[in-house]
Curated annotation (Swiss-Prot):
EC number: 2.7.1.167, 2.7.7.70
PANTHER family referenced in this protein's UniProt entry, alphabetically: BIFUNCTIONAL PROTEIN HLDE
Any Gene Ontology CC annotation: cytosol
Keyword Nucleotidyltransferase belongs to the record: yes
Protein name from the UniProt record: Bifunctional protein HldE
Enzyme superclass (EC): transferase
């Protein structure tokens, strides 16, 4: 399935939640204090950035969406700095000022791109303050398509059920970045986006992929959510809805410098995409890519449309689906079979994807409902093909394959043959390209023994990765 960015400028979003100011003091450190065993930092840079719900709003604005921001602030200089910070990018602040409370501030001291300490300046807001904020925000619902509740457990979002119900009654989607052990507070929300720790704090320890899906569906039913997107760090994201198969989206982050604000980026990209007309799976793929960009930056950051376009092209070959872990695939395959779908599987190196590959995979997909492509990892290709191979690393090979309309799932394997992974997955039909004899196809006997079939498909003559490489070398 292809992913294309919608017209973000059409998105109209209201963000309600805990706003704060992220303040950074930055400088070199070259000695230890004589007063205590701590480093001395000579501050040469001070920077303020909107954080929390304000960072969500900035992310939406940076992508090109129209956004209003409602939150609780104090009557202080920090509130003024926060106002200037959001207005710079065209965010409309709708503050409720609480005179006897400070605007929440997170002060971080950094040196050599490392955070040394964080100091928090805050007092919890009262329940009455939250009631007033949500009541004030009701007047904004008629001018937006999506609402984001950004809850950092600081008091702005206390009991939002009535607000959620009113928004849904008006046809407005409500997305929630939740906190705490009671997701019932958000009953009726369109989508909640807990990270794995937040999810397990509510449902208990997750022991397997199947257990995660069972627990997520339990929450959907219990609290009348339309969907749950669990963000899982290096395992990517898992989207669970009531009436569709689950969707696993692998992480795209190559280097992680700072996870500050990553959750904000996810929900802001989701909100902007959905408000601009994207469907939920596409919005999740866009959000996953945006998160992969932002964790490669230091401190609370935003992601621009240009960065998102570049990241989608680099990491997905324009596709947000397909690449899964073996465990994720095993469960997805089980569910596909329960739905009566015929699953076809093939394998190969696919080092340089060419017309012969595309034709072959199209033929394979035509034989069933779902197509799995198992791909040799880099070490396996090198053992099979020799020095100088693979030309393309496995993540890029898989990303390109996942971009093909004929391919549903792509999974890597490390052995020289796919015998083990085929034996584990046992597709309905195993196909192989070339002039193989059926009895020589790895995993074929096991598939047949399990009631499946094995079939050989022809390749287009004269097209091969080796021939392409030799032709390139000859013309250098």
């Amino acid at each position: 399935m292809k992913v294309s960015l919608p017209a973000f400028e059409k998105a109209r979003v209201l963000v309600v939640g805990d706003v704060m100011l992220d303040r950074y003091w930055v400088g070199p450190t070259g000695r230890i204090s004589p007063e205590a065993p701590v480093p001395v930092v000579k501050i040469n840079q001070v920077e303020d950035r909107p954080g929390g719900a304000a960072n969500v709003a900035l992310n939406i604005a940076t992508l090109g969406g129209q956004v209003q921001l409602a939150g609780l602030v104090g009557q202080d200089d920090t509130a003024h700095a926060l106002t200037l910070g959001v207005q710079t990018l065209g965010v409309e602040p709708q503050w409720l000022t609480i005179a006897d409370k400070p605007t929440i501030t997170k002060l971080r001291v950094l040196s050599r791109n490392q955070q040394l300490i964080r100091l928090d300046f805050e007092e919890a807001f009262d329940k009455a303050d939250s009631v007033r904020l949500l009541k004030q925000s009701e007047a904004l619902l008629d001018s937006v398509d999506v609402v984001v509740l950004s809850d950092y457990a600081k008091g702005a979002i206390d009991q939002p059920r009535d607000f959620i119900a009113l928004a849904r009654a008006k046809g407005v989607m409500v997305l929630v970045d939740p906190k705490g052990s009671d997701f019932g507070r958000y009953q009726g929300a369109s989508l909640i986006t807990p990270n794995m720790s937040e999810f397990e704090a509510v449902v208990g320890t997750v022991t397997s992929e199947a257990d995660l899906l069972e627990k997520a569906r339990g929450l959907l039913k219990q609290h009348h959510f339309d969907a749950i997107l669990v963000t899982r760090s290096e395992k990517g994201m898992t989207l669970v809805t009531a009436n569709a198969p689950e969707l696993h989206i692998p992480t795209v982050a190559r280097e992680v410098y700072d996870v500050t604000g990553a959750g904000d980026t996810v929900i802001s990209a989701l909100a902007t995409s959905l408000a601009a007309g994207a469907d939920l799976p596409q919005a999740c793929a866009i959000a996953n890519t945006a998160a992969g960009v932002v964790v490669g930056k230091l401190g609370t950051s935003t992601v621009s449309r240009i960065e998102l376009i570049e990241a989608l092209a680099l990491h997905h070959g324009e596709s947000g689906f397909g690449v899964v872990s073996e465990d994720q695939l095993a469960y997805a395959l089980e569910q596909a079979k329960l739905r009566g779908e015929r699953v076809v599987m093939t394998n190969g190196c696919f080092d340089i994807l060419h017309a012969g590959h595309v034709s072959y995979l199209k033929q394979a997909k035509a034989l069933g409902d779902r197509l799995i492509v198992a791909v040799n990892d880099d070490a396996s290709v090198k053992r099979l093909k020799g020095e100088g191979r693979p030309v393309n690393q496995v993540d890029r090979r898989m990303a390109v394959l996942a971009g093909l309309a004929s391919v549903d799932w792509v999974v890597p394997f490390s052995e020289d043959t796919p015998q083990r992974i085929i034996t584990r997955l046992l597709p309905n039909l195993l196909v192989k390209g070339g002039d193989y004899k059926l009895e020589d196809i790895a995993g074929g006997a096991e598939v047949i023994a399990a009631g499946g079939q094995v079939q050989v498909l022809g390749f287009e003559d004269g097209i091969s990765t080796t021939a392409i490489i030799q032709n390139i070398m000859a013309n250098q």
